[in-house]
Amino acid sequence: MTLHITDFRDGFPMGTTRITDENDADNNVPITLEVVKLAAGESVAITAANETAWLLMNGAASGTVGGTEFSFERSSLFDESSSCFHVSAGTNIQFQCSIDTEFTVYSCNNTKSFEARVFSPADVANEPRGKGQVNDRCLRYVRTIFDGSNSDPNTELVLGEVITFQGAWSSYPPHHHAQPEIYHYRFTEPQGYGHGELGETVLKVRNFDTVKILDLNDHAQCAAPGYGMYYSWVIRHLPDDRYTVPEFTEEHAWIMDPESKYWDPEV
């Protein structure tokens, strides 16, 4: 499967759409990504087969996961923080949607047990990353839902969201890491677009696109002026190398120093 998946630019149908499969033969990122769209009144009652995270994109749902109750509602990816639940294989998931609802669902083949977690917007900060760097040209909001700092050692996924301001950069300075990753994109307008780097390759990304990130490639991003850019990001830990922080490309890391000198127009 290609690294840049553009098959769904017209949107997703009701039901379940698989975008990536952890067993893909080509350009394999060992994470399955699906979009699940449910109608008002529709319910879900399943037992998770693998480690799985359900991230609410829009809509409203309430129920229980592993005996823990939740009630989610979201109308804006850009102005509201994350609602998500993260479960291990064998966990019972039951909920009902009060309005049309959409989730992105991330899973991987991991049968190790851990306690089900529910994350509400109050649990997930809008971190203003890049604040004070190069006149705030790469200021963005990073929402880390769960990573090694707040999840069980038996987990294998890391999940978060990034809000890129219109005309600005994110995932900057360019950075890379050994662990495979997936970005899934949405924009404030249907015609919105941005650019995503994969090493020396630059991709034009649009609404509903997905990009696989492999091979220690740098993956800085930018949004076209006028269009806010959202992407979810999901990483899978490696067996002997759990993800902690990215490695910034040395030649561009100087911009992280708030005292760094850079050109700005005088008039």
Mark where each language-model region is.
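Hydrophobic, proline/glycine-rich low-complexity stretches
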Residues: 1-44, 51-60, 255-257, 261-267
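Conserved hydrophobic/aromatic beta-strand scaffold that supports enzyme active sites
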Residues: 33-37, 53, 84-86, 105, ...
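A short glycine-rich, His/Asp/Glu-containing loop-to-beta-strand
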Residues: 10-43, 136-182
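Glycine- and acidic-residue-biased ligand/ion/polar-headgroup-sensing regions
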Residues: 48-69, 166-167, 172, 178-210, ...
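Conserved metal-binding segment of the jelly-roll/cupin
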Residues: 78-98, 108, 205-226, 232-236
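Extended, compositionally biased flexible segments
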Residues: 25, 32-96
